[in-house]
């Protein structure tokens, strides 16, 4: 029986029977007289605040345990708050006499918490793998640099971090060894891999995993923006500055009842400067329209009529838009960005290849159903575009592109509702079809933004805690996979393994039985801690 269990038994006995001698307490609680004496003295030392008696009860002690562990878990593990800060927090709550709240004592609890997390997540992952279903991963791979280089491999569709592993290098051999070992343990396969086009990552996809190497579309767009957006923006600001100067000159030369030559000249200059502003604003608008066209082109459906499109059609449209950007830059005599444009053009075939691969997955799913041409037309031209655009609307922040997608969704929704097959299906069957369509929609991933965001989170946490033991990295992975909840309440692990898991915090809380004992120190020292 531990320290706190004996204390709770003694306090309950005192509450039930009133004042008792040490001998009587020992007899009723089955605790040695010497222990009863020490524990009773400890209770008296803790009883210095009006609420102190609450923590001596079983309910109060359980709540105190939850408070300590929840603080360490939420603020320490998930937010990177230091132990010194949390120790001060517990002191402000007047808990220094109730429980060990020093940084060293909290560190012990944190270590127990980390061990419980590692063991719990290990069991749950084995349970998920034991289901025996071969999982199809849409991988995003990248590396981040903390105290050592960390290789990050994430399933983009579910958000599940497949692997976060420290490594000395990022060569193809290292990546292949790390990824293949993890895939074997999970019984999973990679459908395609999204990356920043590092040579080792391209080789990993095409040779190691034998899948499509998908360029990160965000990186492509970023390369285009770096090429011309800054230059065009500078021309707009320069033209606006010249217009402001011309207007100020005109205001100084303006006379109430005269129109001499100098004022006419100033007005002409203002009109010319206004023309330059209009010209460069139109150039900027045209450039942004081209960028929006690129973004709206790389989809399984045409944005204009939501008709299914192929990789060849997408590639032609992307190349045509890139040529339009180049022509715009040449007409406006902007600095040539040959290397950047060539880099983007070379990635167009791999970008467009995702469209045919996505349709291949769709056809593999519906092939066992042996659909008639009319049913296939309903799936390809009504159901899938309706669900796809509806999902993309929720993910798009740009107001212009969102409005365009909303218009496409509204049109497909109307066609879907009016179709004879839609009207004939029961609500349950229709819901199953829509759930399947949503899963296929989520399989179209153009960027590795999730893994980039993960890298930023790791860097921020590492900065907050001024470096961490390597063991903490695995704990962060577990917290992300099993306790990072989406709006619908699901976690990456529940989406990846397609099953529910208990609440991670409650699971580890049940494994922590005792809290550290408070220090025996003078009252004044405790107050000034």
Placement of each model-derived feature along the sequence:
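Acidic/histidine-rich catalytic cores and adjacent linkers
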Residues: 6-8, 12, 17, 22, ...
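RNase H-like polynucleotidyl transferase catalytic core
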Residues: 212-228, 431-444
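Short, amphipathic alpha-helical "recognition" segments used to contact nucleic acids or chromatin
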Residues: 2-20, 65-81
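Short alpha-helical "recognition helix" segments of helix-turn-helix
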Residues: 24-29, 86
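RNase H-like nuclease fold core
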Residues: 52-194, 198-217, 224-328
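DNA major-groove recognition helix of helix-turn-helix
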Residues: 40-43, 110
């Amino acid at each position: 029986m531990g320290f706190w269990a004996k204390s709770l038994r003694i306090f309950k006995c005192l509450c039930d029977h009133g004042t008792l001698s040490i001998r009587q307490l020992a007899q009723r609680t089955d605790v040695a007289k010497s222990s009863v004496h020490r524990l009773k003295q400890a209770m008296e030392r803790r009883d210095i605040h009006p609420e102190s008696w609450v923590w001596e009860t079983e309910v109060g002690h359980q709540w105190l345990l939850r408070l300590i562990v929840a603080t360490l878990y939420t603020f320490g593990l998930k937010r990177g708050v230091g132990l010194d800060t949390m120790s001060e927090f517990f002191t402000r709550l007047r808990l220094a006499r109730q429980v060990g709240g020093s940084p060293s004592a909290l560190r012990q609890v944190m270590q127990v918490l980390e061990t419980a997390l590692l063991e719990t997540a290990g069991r749950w992952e084995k349970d998920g793998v034991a289901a025996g279903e071969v999982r199809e991963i849409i991988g995003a791979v990248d590396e981040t640099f903390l105290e050592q280089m960390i290789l990050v491999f994430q399933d983009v569709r579910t958000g599940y971090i497949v692997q976060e592993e420290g490594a000395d290098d990022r060569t193809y051999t290292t990546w292949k060894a790390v990824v293949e070992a993890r895939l074997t343990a999970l019984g999973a396969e990679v459908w395609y891999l999204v990356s920043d086009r590092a040579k080792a990552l391209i080789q990993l996809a095409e040779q190691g995993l034998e899948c499509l190497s998908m360029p990160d579309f965000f990186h492509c767009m970023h390369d285009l923006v770096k090429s011309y957006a800054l230059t065009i923006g500078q021309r707009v600001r320069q033209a606006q500055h010249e217009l402001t100067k011309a207007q100020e000159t005109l205001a100084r030369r303006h006379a109430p009842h005269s129109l001499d030559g100098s004022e006419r000249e100033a007005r002409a200059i203002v009109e010319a400067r206004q023309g330059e502003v209009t010209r460069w604003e139109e150039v900027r608008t045209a450039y942004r329209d081209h960028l929006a066209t690129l973004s709206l082109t790389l989809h399984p459906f045409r944005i204009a009529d939501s008709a299914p499109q192929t990789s060849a059609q997408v590639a032609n449209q992307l190349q045509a838009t890139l040529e339009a950007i180049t022509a715009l830059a040449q007409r406006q005599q902007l600095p040539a960005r040959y290397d950047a444009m060539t880099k983007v053009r070379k990635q167009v075939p791999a970008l467009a290849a995702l469209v045919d691969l996505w349709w291949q997955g769709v056809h593999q799913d519906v092939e066992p159903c042996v659909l008639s041409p009319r049913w296939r037309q309903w799936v390809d031209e009504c159901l899938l575009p309706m669900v796809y655009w509806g999902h993309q609307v929720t993910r798009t922040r740009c107001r212009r592109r969102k409005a365009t997608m909303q218009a496409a969704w509204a049109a497909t929704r109307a066609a879907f509702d009016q179709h004879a097959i839609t009207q004939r299906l029961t609500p349950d069957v229709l819901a199953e079809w829509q759930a399947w369509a949503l899963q296929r929609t989520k399989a179209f991933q153009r960027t590795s933004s999730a893994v980039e965001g993960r890298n930023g989170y790791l860097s921020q946490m590492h900065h907050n805690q001024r470096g961490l033991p390597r063991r903490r990295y695995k704990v962060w992975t577990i917290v992300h996979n099993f306790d990072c909840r989406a709006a619908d309440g699901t976690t990456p692990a529940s989406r990846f393994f397609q099953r529910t898991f208990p609440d991670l915090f409650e699971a580890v809380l049940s494994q922590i039985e005792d809290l550290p004992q408070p220090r025996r120190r003078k009252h004044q020292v405790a107050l000034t801690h």
